[in-house]
């Protein structure tokens, strides 16, 4: 399992794998977390990092009582598979 940190001051969730940083960017807007972009560099792709970033970000939003607006296509497809 990948360790994901919420970097609130940078408006994103981050994971560092083998020294390479992946992240999911978000914005807070009127009780909603707008998930805008997911970046997983090729050297760490295919390891489930994007899924862990998304799972953690969505769980955090739900714990805070916030709605999720999946503007990122990866987050949108992940939510369709994990309602």
Model regions and ranges:
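A conserved beta-strand-loop-helix scaffold within acyl/acetyltransferase catalytic domains
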Residues: 13, 18-33
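A short, internal acetyl-CoA/4′-phosphopantetheine-binding micro-motif in the GNAT/acyltransferase core
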Residues: 38-45
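Conserved acetyl-CoA-binding loop-helix of GNAT-fold acetyltransferases
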Residues: 46-59
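Conserved GNAT acetyl-CoA-binding A-motif
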Residues: 60-73
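Short, charged, intrinsically disordered terminal tails
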Residues: 77-83
